[in-house]
Amino acid sequence: MINRSSGKDRDRSRSGDKELRINHKIKAREVRVIFDNGTQSVLPIEDAIKCARDAELDLVEISPNSVPPVCKIIDYGKYKFHQEKRQKEQKRNQKIIKLKEVRMQPKIDTHDLDFKYRNILGFLKEGNKVKVTIRFRGRELAHTHLGYGILESILERVGESNYVLESPAKMEGKTMFLIIAPKSKK
């Protein structure tokens, strides 16, 4: 079938998206045509369009950057449907990892630390990275060893079995932080 546009000219150079050129929108004089049976031949554009029209299909430019451009004789509507279906499938399988932050102070109580630890474990089980931040104020900066102790106790409780330390404890200005990430499931 020959694709007839409904008045909307979707020229790839203008729209910016990856819309493929079909039939008379292909600008090359010669194209490499791949037929249904897999054979290839280099043809003038008029002959290639005529072959596509005879087969009641479309001439679709697959690789415009090669010399000569590569075209296939296929049903464009069906091809576009399969491409969109494949993109949706890839998008569905894509895992988005967020960075969650848990803040605390160096003079945190044990019950509060337990509560923060449960939050950290929950975030890691959801598959998110966790940035554990300790903010120092005033004279607390003289006691950074307390912050390192808190971060070490969190790491011991989290354990190495399911999680990996992505960024070790660092001090930036008045804050100390580390980043824990879940191990990738491959």
UniProtKB/Swiss-Prot annotation:
GO CC, alphabetical: cytosol; membrane
Sequence segments annotated as region (Disordered): 1-21
Pfam families membership: IF3_C, IF3_N
Localization (cell): Cytoplasm
Major localisation: cytoplasm
PROSITE patterns tied to this protein: IF3 (PS00938)
Domain of life: Bacteria
Keywords: Cytoplasm, Initiation factor, Protein biosynthesis
One GO process term, biological-process aspect: ribosome disassembly
Keyword Iron-sulfur: no
MF terms (GO), sorted A to Z: ribosome binding; translation initiation factor activity
Family matches, as NCBIfam families: infC
Oligomeric and partner information: Monomer.
Family from the record: Belongs to the IF-3 family.
Record PANTHER family: TRANSLATION INITIATION FACTOR IF-3, TRANSLATION INITIATION FACTOR IF-3, MITOCHONDRIAL
Reported function: IF-3 binds to the 30S ribosomal subunit and shifts the equilibrium between 70S ribosomes and their 50S and 30S subunits in favor of the free subunits, thus enhancing the availability of 30S subunits on which protein synthesis initiation begins.
UniProt protein name: Translation initiation factor IF-3
Organism: Borrelia turicatae (strain 91E135)
